């Protein structure tokens, strides 16, 4: 079982499975009661999602709002929703996604596709700005997996790792 494997070299590190790798669903998944009852405590739409929708609308010229302000409000609202501190530093960060390194099989290593940082740059082209907005929206949508998936299918963002089993996706 991949999750119960003990390896002292990985102690204290995040262990995850890259999208597209092949594992039987019985190794990692079960149907949650959350998905089979009539009501839910899960958010259907959050204030941060609304801010990101407004940022996208402004970027596309559908409103007179300032896309940078809406973008920053979206990130800030998401941080506040989840009780996370440091939003000011995050919004100034120029850090980008790291490459994926598989410590067990280097054939799975892959360069990060997402090349945008959280910091807004008014000189970026429209597509880069859209990538920033949607990438942050996707992060803020936790735990709305289905909505985040639909957003990624709609826009192509965030640029995630290529699925090993579906290289043409």
Protein language model annotation of sequence segments:
Residues 152-161, 165:
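An amphipathic alpha-helical core segment
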